[in-house]
Amino acid sequence: MDKDSAIKLTNEEWESSIVPELIEYIKIPNKSPAFDPNWNKNGYMEKVVEQFAAWCRNQDIKGMRLDVIRLPERTPLIYIDIPGDIENTVLLYGHLDKQPEMSGWAKGFGPWKPVLKNNKLYGRGGADDGYAIFTSLLAIKILEAQNIPRARCVVIIEACEESGSYDLPFYIDHLKDKLGKPELVICLDSGCGNYDQLWSTTSLRGLVGGELKIEVLDGGIHSGDASGIVPSSFRLLRQILDRIEDPVSGQILVKDCYVEIPKKRIEQAKFAAGVLGNDIFNRFPLKENSKPVSEDPVELILNRSWRPALSYLGVGGLPEISDAGNVLRPFTSIKLSMRLPPTSSAKKVSKKINEILTKNPPNGAKVSFKTDWSVDGWMAPEISPWLEKALNNASENYFKKPAVLMGEGWSIPFMGMLGEKFPDAQFLITGVLGPGSNAHGPNAVSYTHLTLPTKRIV
């Protein structure tokens, strides 16, 4: 491949065509169904589908066929089939639905307000995962421009990923005859440890999430009257949470949440730690004097990829401080998110956590745990020599540095399903969610110059 020609075409297409499309995409509040139950009626998802499909149809790619598939009562899916020069099939995946707004955006910025500043495009969804469809087709155009033979390419863009991809299995079954058996799966919904080389994700954590609720009263009572007699639902909540998490160290106390970490993954974590050093935690906006749970980069990488961790996402039953009167509240609820090792069973852990949280309620309080997420993690198959060579060649060619293999801490439900359906396929899971990207949070950003490594692999 002529690297200079590839870079030239990429820069031209990215600046003149793709960035303007991403700007329009960010303006649309097409939240995933879990965050917008009226997504179909509101029409935002359809607006994005139409935008993406229109752009794709304007690309001059030989033999490309595009269909927008709409199964009954399901979010839509964009399916693109591009014939190749060899028999192999490459499956490229992305999604177009978004996380909700989130608070804390800087002045002048917002989730649906695209701001282009210093090669950074701020707004919800650009890097997670709006760029995927544009990157996929641009990569193919680069190969066509240089007459480089390639495999058949199938692109699928779903609209339910941020809700757990619960619609996707139906589409995969619907399309099974068309999909065939891909030899390589490329997913553009992952991350990178830095922006200085190519990163490939070797594993993804599983997730069990739900709402823990503790009820002590039928209604609020004057705290001066009831406190000291009626137990605080917040105190009981803390007491119950201590059953699954050490309140000092944060270590998870549920044995079912742990697995043996493969030696190969430990070796890869050590290599990645040598590349990243303290950047593994310096990339986060820690408050002054705040410290990470460890200062050993290897342990932090393994914590983030192969060990369980509990996060508290939201709370119910607590008023805003400005509205907080002297009332002993009737209940407290909290949204929990337990990240799990890639090879653990989310179903088994979910059952165990429910049992631990709800048995023997303190003071006879009413305790419930309603699970809303239960997703297995994923571990990539052993990388084939040809793919490992391609990764390193691409990274050395464009960055003068080797590729890095590392586990990620988030979940992509689609990958576990694909691993089961295509056990012989190789996987390249990569993306632009690196330092400063802040996916799912405020001030989410896409770095507008960072897509070329993925294109080179295609």
Predicted segments with their positions:
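N-terminal helical capping/dimerization or prosegment-like subdomains
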Residues: M1-G104, F331, K335
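Acidic-enriched catalytic cores of C-N bond-cleaving enzymes acting on peptides and small amides
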Residues: G193, T202, S223-V315, S344-K366
